[in-house]
Every structure is written in structure tokens, then in C-alpha cells.
């Protein structure tokens, strides 16, 4: 599925330690956001002074002033060793769906709310980022989902998701009917507001709000979470990450249905369509500061209790 680019990387400047893992760095952020722009300007200046080649996503480049090398996300993925995303998890998800097809590390500076995927603080990123650039970091691979919509056996639409693919009606509080198959084995029929198919990464997002379990990031699994099911005994279920999930929409449904990928990309669904959700071949390569602790992140973001003794 990946797009191949034959783009040679420019040589690193002599002021950079040649043992470093990173030479060309991409900056990505939320457009027209004052806090994000401020952090991006600081990052650009800080990295440029140290001799790194810095590429800036074109959507935010015009807000950073002159002498900026503006490129699109695809070129950042093709040319950069590291991409720094400034914003919230939503900005990280949008960038990740593109960057996952390239061998580029991704780290985040949190300018959002919870920030499960954005490790660095916006007001004091320099110390932690300097250590990362010196090679002191942990790498974590997060797999993506691929969602496909078939109509009369023909592929009509597809996209990828980092967090989840959600089958739902276009109308609020509108129940739909569908069947669910796991690896072509019938599991159940469902009358509900929809179905969430989530990765471990997405298990702390929409799936958690709908009553799903939290899956640790290294778990090779998917979780299916029904949204307000009409059958109260229908609970979330965890399946192997290599499973193929098929949802068949009843012909009796209305026409205003869709599959949402991370809440950003929407695929139109008609009655009788089949939705296939499976693990994608693409992976997001997340970079964390050395000593990153997932359970510390959960405690701080979800307000869990600290140690008693």
C-alpha cells in the first residue's frame, strides 16, 4: 500500500554529531493555533541553530516566518529521519496515517488535552528532546487498521486508522442492524448504535468511552466494542490482531451510514454493504524519551491513584 519515493537525503551538516540517529527533521502542527505556532517557532530555531536540516509541513510553514522549507506530509515521510508533531492526539493521528508508510520516527509535543501519544511538554521540550536526538530514546511500533467497504463484491472505499474504525449511522441516536463475522465465522447479529473496532492504541480513546477494556500497546489484539447494543448481554470482545473482522449491514437499514477512521476520514456505507477491518501492513514508529512508562501515562492522564507506600 505504501507510496515509494526516490528522494535522496541531503548530507548532514558538519556541526551535527555523525553518530546521531537523526539528520533531517520534519515539523508538523495544528494550523492557526497560537500555542502550536509558538512551539513550532521555538523548535525550528532550536533545531536550526544545532545544524539540523528542518522541513516544515506546508499547512503551518507560512505562519512561522521566512526562510522556511515548506513541504507536504509525504515529503516529510520520504526525506526525514524524525517527525515532530506539535498538537494533541488528533494531530498525531492525522500525521501518523500518512507517516506510517515510511520508515520515519515520530515524536509528539503536547499542545492538546490528554496527549496519550504526545510525550514532550510544550514549555520545556529542549532537555528531553536533546537526549532523544543524542540517541537516548525508546522505540515502539504501533500497528494500524485497514478498513474497506465492499458493495456487490466490489471495493468502493478504503482507508487506514491508528485508533479505530467505527461503523455508525449518520444520524445521532439512530439504531442500525448488522452481522459480525470473525475470520468468516459468524459471531452475532447486532442492533446497536454502531460498532467500534479498535487497536491497542485506540483502546484509551473512543473504545474506552464506550466501555471497552484498555489494551497495553504491545498486545497483538483488537477489541470490538458495541455502541449502545439493544442486547444487554452483548459485551466488548478481544480477538487476535491477525483476525479479519467482517460487518455486513442489513438491507433494511437507512442509507445514511458510514465508517469513520480515527474520526477524521469517513467512508460512505449503503444497506447491504460489507465492511472488512483487518490489521494493516503499515506501522507507526513512535519515539519516546528513554524510560517511557505506559502505566505512568495512564495514571497521569486518567487520574488513577498513586502508590500508597
Swiss-Prot record:
Record bears the keyword Kinase: yes
Active site per database record: 89 (proton acceptor)
Record keywords, A-Z: ATP-binding, Cytoplasm, Kinase, NAD, NADP, Nucleotide-binding, Transferase
Compartment(s): Cytoplasm
Family of this protein: Belongs to the NAD kinase family.
Top-level division of the source organism's lineage: Bacteria
GO molecular function annotations of the record: ATP binding; metal ion binding; NAD binding; NAD+ kinase activity
Species the sequence originates in: Shewanella sp. (strain MR-7)
Cofactor: a divalent metal cation
Signal peptide location: none
Gene label: nadK
Catalysed reaction, written as an equation: NAD(+) + ATP = ADP + NADP(+) + H(+)
PANTHER family listed in its UniProt record: NAD KINASE
Protein's UniProt name: NAD kinase
GO cellular component: cytoplasm
Amino acid at each position: 500500500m505504501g507510496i515509494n519515493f526516490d528522494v535522496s537525503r541531503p548530507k548532514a551538516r558538519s556541526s551535527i554529531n555523525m553518530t546521531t540517529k537523526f539528520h533531517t527533521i520534519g515539523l508538523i502542527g495544528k494550523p492557526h493555533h497560537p500555542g502550536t505556532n509558538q512551539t513550532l517557532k521555538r523548535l525550528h530555531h532550536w533545531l536550526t541553530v544545532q545544524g539540523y536540516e528542518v522541513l516544515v509541513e506546508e499547512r503551518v510553514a507560512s505562519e512561522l516566518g521566512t526562510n522556511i522549507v515548506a513541504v507536504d506530509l509525504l515529503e516529510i515521510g520520504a526525506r526525514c529521519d524524525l517527525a515532530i508533531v506539535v498538537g494533541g492526539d488528533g494531530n498525531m493521528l492525522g500525521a501518523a496515517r500518512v507517516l506510517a508508510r515510511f520508515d520515519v520516527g515520530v515524536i509528539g509535543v503536547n499542545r492538546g488535552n490528554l496527549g496519550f501519544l504526545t510525550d514532550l511538554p510544550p514549555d520545556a521540550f529542549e532537555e528531553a528532546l536533546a537526549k532523544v536526538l543524542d540517541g537516548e530514546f525508546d522505540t515502539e511500533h504501533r500497528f494500524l487498521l485497514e478498513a474497506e467497504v465492499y458493495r456487490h463484491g466490489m471495493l468502493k472505499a478504503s482507508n487506514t486508522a491508528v485508533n479505530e474504525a467505527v461503523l455508525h449511522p449518520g444520524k445521532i441516536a439512530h439504531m442500525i442492524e448488522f452481522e459480525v463475522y470473525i475470520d468468516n465465522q459468524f459471531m452475532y447479529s447486532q442492533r446497536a448504535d454502531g460498532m467500534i473496532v479498535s487497536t491497542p492504541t485506540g483502546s484509551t480513546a473512543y473504545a474506552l468511552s464506550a466501555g471497552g477494556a484498555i489494551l497495553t500497546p504491545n498486545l497483538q489484539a483488537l477489541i470490538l466494542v458495541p455502541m449502545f447494543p439493544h442486547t444487554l448481554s452483548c459485551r466488548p470482545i478481544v480477538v487476535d490482531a491477525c483476525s479479519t473482522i467482517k460487518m455486513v449491514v442489513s438491507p433494511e437499514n437507512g442509507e445514511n451510514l458510514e465508517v469513520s477512521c480515527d474520526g477524521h476520514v469517513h467512508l460512505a456505507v449503503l444497506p447491504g454493504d460489507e465492511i472488512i477491518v483487518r490489521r494493516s501492513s503499515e506501522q507507526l514508529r513512535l519515539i519516546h524519551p528513554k524510560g517511557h512508562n505506559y502505566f505512568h501515562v495512564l495514571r497521569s492522564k486518567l487520574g488513577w491513584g498513586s502508590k500508597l507506600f
